[in-house]
From Swiss-Prot:
Gene: RAB20
Protein name as annotated: Ras-related protein Rab-20
GO molecular function: GTP binding; GTPase activity
Tissue occurrence: Low or absent expression in normal pancreas and stronger expression in 15 of 18 exocrine pancreatic adenocarcinomas (at protein level).
Reaction it catalyzes: GTP + H2O = GDP + phosphate + H(+)
Lipidation (S-geranylgeranyl cysteine): C232, C233
Motif interval(s): Switch 1: 28-41
PANTHER family listed in its UniProt record: DRAB5-RELATED (PTHR24073)
Topology in membrane: Lipid-anchor
UniProt keyword terms in alphabetical order: Cytoplasmic vesicle, Golgi apparatus, GTP-binding, Hydrolase, Lipoprotein, Magnesium, Membrane, Metal-binding, Nucleotide-binding, Prenylation, Protein transport, Transport
Ligand binding (GTP): G17, K18, T19, D32, T36, G58, N113, K114, D116, A184, K185
EC code: 3.6.5.2
Positions of Mg(2+) binding: T19, T36, D55
Family: Belongs to the small GTPase superfamily. Rab family.
Amino acid sequence: MRKPDSKIVLLGDMNVGKTSLLQRYMERRFPDTVSTVGGAFYLKQWRSYNISIWDTAGREQFHGLGSMYCRGAAAIILTYDVNHRQSLVELEDRFLGLTDTASKDCLFAIVGNKVDLTEEGALAGQEKEECSPNMDAGDRVSPRAPKQVQLEDAVALYKKILKYKMLDEQDVPAAEQMCFETSAKTGYNVDLLFETLFDLVVPMILQQRAERPSHTVDISSHKPPKRTRSGCCA
C-alpha cells in the first residue's frame, strides 16, 4: 500500500454520525448504527494523491486515542449533531485540545450532521416527495423538531478555534466555507464536505514536498581529488 500523502481526521462525540458520514462518502451507503472502537481509516485517491481519512471513537474510554490519530493531520472535521446542542459544546470542551498534535497549518471544518431529522430537513424531503404522483397522503414526511444548533453557532465555534490556534482569519479559509450542515442518511452536502477539504489539502501537500531537503547530489560541481607526486590522492 502506498504511503498516504496527507491525513484528515474526524472528531466528535459518540452518536453524531462520524462513521456514517465516512461510509456514505466512501461506500455510497448509509449503515446501521455502528460504534467505532479506537479508530478506523479509509484511503482516498484524489487526483494523483493518496489521502487517509481517519474515523475516531467518540466514547470517553477511547478519548485519549484522538490525540494520537490527530498527529500530523492536515485537516480535522469536528462533527456535531444539529439536534443536540451539547454535542457542539463537547467539541470545544473535550475535543479541541486533542488537535494540538495536528500540523501547524491544519485546516478545521465544523460539521453539523443529521440535518434530515430537523424541521428544515423534513420540509426539504417533503418537497421532493410531493413531486411523485404515486405518493399517498399517509406517506408524507412527518413534521420534525427545529434545530437546536444553528449554522451561526458553528461559525462562532470556528472563530474560537482560530483564536485558540492563534491564527489570523485572513490566512485561513473563511468560516462560511468551512462550516457545513450534512445528512449521512440522504447524502446531503457529504460530497461537498470531503471534496472541499481535499482541494484545500492538495496545495499543502505540494508545499510540504517543496520544503523537503533534496537528496540529489550535483555531480557537475564535484571535483576529482588532486594527486600528489607519490601518486596518492590528496
